Amino acid sequence: MFEGLYGLSCVENQVLAFLRQQRVEVAPLYYNSAVPLKELFFFLVIQGIRPVYFDRVRRIQDDLRERGILAFEKRNEALSFWLDRADDGSGPEASLILVTPAFTAETLMARGFRGDHYVRLLRRNQDWVIQNDIPDREVVLPLEELEKAYAGSGFCIRLCREPDRDDVRFFWSSRTFKPENHTAFWFYEQDLDGVPDVGSRLRDMTGIYKQLRYRTAAYYETHGLNTTFIWKKGAEMERIYALAEYYNLKRSIPPSQFFSLLNEIARMDNALMSELRMKLGG
């Protein structure tokens, strides 16, 4: 359900999955994903901004709502409101509901980086179905368990129209981060001096980084570029992210190893973005 989708939050993943169900091509929506590594490092490591508050890339649902493509409204309602709206997932509307942290951890086995977690609510025959993004799974719940899991709010989503050529051109012209302007960036060991909780911050940065580079590859593919060279680095990006998570959990890592990991990311990213710049004529 969520394979090949690169949202930066559970809600964005759900929106992307809904759009794909509606046969909307989602890759053009990743237009502003080529955030330079130095900006990711500054905001997520130096400043310590949590991924949930990272706003250098605007959320896709906000872009689409502003363009009149998507109706997206948060509602604080009784569970009965969402039960009445639920369908089998084939229609032009969707309901996301907030679930409790206990349900998120114990039933969904999800480990998010924020306290609130949203899932899609579906009705299939007489069953209530919860659709989760990460891990990608569905859970069938009796009503009494759903009542315990529900945490009091949700989002109403409706596709108003499909993105058209004007939207695609608008997204291209609205890019803040243009790979054709890429300049190489390297780290210095003293960049980490005085940074608290380096392991957690570096884990957050690498998690956002890999998602954004996947999005970048998907976006520029829609503009006729061969971005296989980025996709081929997917396994390496996942390995670096796993290593950053290991360093975070171990909590006894010397600064030199964090610096080594940063340089590994920089070497890879400079090569990727330089090639993308060349393909774009920069």
Task: Show the residue positions of the predicted features.
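Conserved active-site-adjacent core of cysteine acyl-enzyme catalytic domains
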Residues: 1-163
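Generic structural signal of hydrophobic/aromatic residues within well-ordered alpha-helices
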Residues: 15, 60, 64, 82-83, ...
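Phosphate-binding glycine-rich loops and adjacent basic patches that engage nucleotide phosphates
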Residues: 20-28, 41-49, 174-180, 198-205, ...
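Intrinsic-disorder-associated interaction segments
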Residues: 4, 8, 53, 176-177, ...
